Each structure stands twice: as C-alpha cells, then as structure tokens.
Amino acid sequence: MWPPCGTLRTLALARSRGARACSGDGGVSYTQGQSPEPRTREYFYYVDHQGQLFLDDSKMKNFITCFKDPQFLVTFFSRLRPNRSGRYEAAFPFLSPCGRERNFLRCEDRPVVFTHLLTADHGPPRLSYCGGGEALAVPFEPARLLPLAANGRLYHPAPERAGGVGLVRSALAFELSACFEYGPGAPALPSHVRWQGRRLALTMDLAPLLLAARSP
C-alpha cells in the first residue's frame, strides 16, 4: 500500500471545489476523491513545464501550492504509466495507480520534466526529474538531447512507461545550451554538443517519438 495515500486523500478533498470542468480537455467534469465504484477513489493532477505537480483543479498553481513531499513524488512518478483505464483517457493521458486509487495526470507538455543534473565523483551523470532527486533519475545522454525549434524547448529520453521523452526545465536547458555547437551559416538548431571533452553529434532520434506523442 502507498503510505502517503491517506494524507493525499485528505488534502485533495480539502482543496476540492466540487465537480469542475477542466479547461482545454473537452469539457470533462470530475470531483476530486470521487468514487465511481465501491472502495475506489479517483484524483486528478497536473504537471507544469517546470515539473511541479498540482491538484488539477487548483486555481492557483505556483511553488506554494505544488506538491513537495519527496516520498509522495517518487511514488507518484515511479508508478506513472499511460492511461488505459477506459476513463478520462483523452483528457488525462497518464495514470499513477495506488491500490484502489486512480491518480489521473495531464501535463502542460510532458509528464516527465527534468529539473537537475546530478554529478558524482564516481559514476556517470544523471538527470533527475519532477522533484524526486536521485530516486527519480535517468542516465544523462547528451548526444540524444533534442532541441525543438517549434517551441524553443529541449527534450531528453525518459522512462518508456512515461512516454519515452521528457522535457528539460528551462533553467537547466539554458545551462546545457552552452555546450551546443552550430553548423556554418548559424542554423536554427545545433548539430553537436560538447560534453566532458568530447564532441558528440546530436542524434535527433527522439523527434519521431515526440511528434507521435503530440499527434491527436
């Protein structure tokens, strides 16, 4: 069983304002903590482009109102998977199950947002995501960074169960952009990245996966 579930349930019900249509999701309505069947509860969340997690119906979404408990964040995002529940699949494309609870997630861009580059004296660097520190991290693959001209954002491989592609938070993307090299004629996108003394060609192999994820 998921230890933070009880606390989370209390918070969700306390903050809920009753049935509420989510903007931009086709007019779907829900109530936080609703029970569509016996002993089952449903909650609804939103992750922004900074990797901050909120109750979806929170009117104010900022650092003060986002979830910060590391244990909860690790459990929530480590269980994240595509929503194949038959409920709210279009509006909330990801689901983090917790026993008899269904925790639905929609996102501003991607469900995984990389927030920190973790380096150590021994071992390769890792990218941490969504406030989970070392417990939510993947190996850093600089050659597979994907800069997208359409929105000016940077992407990196993410766990397959969470869509395979994650967004790099803007502050971290700015730091990493200093490592990019551009070809002759100052093209819009970089062609190489310099990392730890090596010059690596950007593979751009994430582009088809990202475009497929964005297709209706």
Swiss-Prot record:
It comes from the Eukaryota. InterPro entries: DUF4505. GO terms for cellular component: mitochondrion. Pfam families: DUF4505 (PF14956). PANTHER family: UPF0598 PROTEIN C8ORF82. Belongs to the UPF0598 family. This is UPF0598 protein C8orf82.
